[in-house]
Curated annotation (Swiss-Prot):
Keywords: Cytoplasm, DNA-binding. It is found in: Cytoplasm, Nucleoid. It comes from Bordetella pertussis (strain Tohama I / ATCC BAA-589 / NCTC 13251). Belongs to the YbaB/EbfC family. GO terms for cellular component: bacterial nucleoid; cytosol. Homodimer. NCBIfam families: DNA_YbaB_EbfC (TIGR00103). Residues 87-108 are annotated as: Disordered. This is Nucleoid-associated protein BP1550. GO terms for molecular function: DNA binding.
Amino acid sequence: MMKGQLAGLMRQAQQMQENMKKAQDALAEIQVEGAAGGGLVKVTMTCRHDVKRVAIDASLLGEDKDMLEDLVAAAFNDALRKAEATSQEKMASVTAGMPLPPGMKLPF
């Protein structure tokens, strides 16, 4: 490989690394909301999986504890799926044209 080609590859790798960092920083700011029980339980989290808020409608507070726990878990899982989908969309633009093994998720 010629020296010029290697330098070009190094520049591309550095640019991709910078773009990846910017995308990860942006994902830390994007919030998604998961819901369960027709919106009576809501979980808000970032696309980096930091839970920011759990909202439980007051009408559920006197209800069955097991049901409430199930609704919180379902809302969390809904938010997690939305965060993953949003992350994949955002990272796809960064990794476009980059050959990745099947099933490999970014960010690592």
